[in-house]
Amino acid sequence: MLILTRRVGETLMIGDQVSVTVLGVKGNQVRIGINAPKDVAVHREEIYERIKNEGDEGQATGGN
């Protein structure tokens, strides 16, 4: 895992098309902004896991 330090307002790049900007820090929460092409899915981990699990259930039941 790559670990980077950024201050509020600073950005990091993932490849050529995805940028992640630190918008703010308040207590133990960090607000980030993500710019990515529309064809790149961006989800919080818990939402991604739910989508993945729903896809697995759909395959197991034949999609209906």
UniProtKB/Swiss-Prot annotation:
- Gene3D superfamilies, from UniProt? Translational regulator CsrA (2.60.40.4380)
Location comes to: Cytoplasm
Q: What is its main location?
A: cytoplasm
Which branch of life, at top level?
Bacteria
One of the entry's Gene Ontology molecular-function terms is:
mRNA 5'-UTR binding
**What job does this protein perform?**
A key translational regulator that binds mRNA to regulate translation initiation and/or mRNA stability. Mediates global changes in gene expression, shifting from rapid growth to stress survival by linking envelope stress, the stringent response and the catabolite repression systems. Usually binds in the 5'-UTR; binding at or near the Shine-Dalgarno sequence prevents ribosome-binding, repressing translation, binding elsewhere in the 5'-UTR can activate translation and/or stabilize the mRNA. Its function is antagonized by small RNA(s).
Q: How does it assemble?
A: Homodimer; the beta-strands of each monomer intercalate to form a hydrophobic core, while the alpha-helices form wings that extend away from the core.
Name of the protein? Translational regulator CsrA
Q: Which organism is it from?
A: Thioalkalivibrio sulfidiphilus (strain HL-EbGR7)
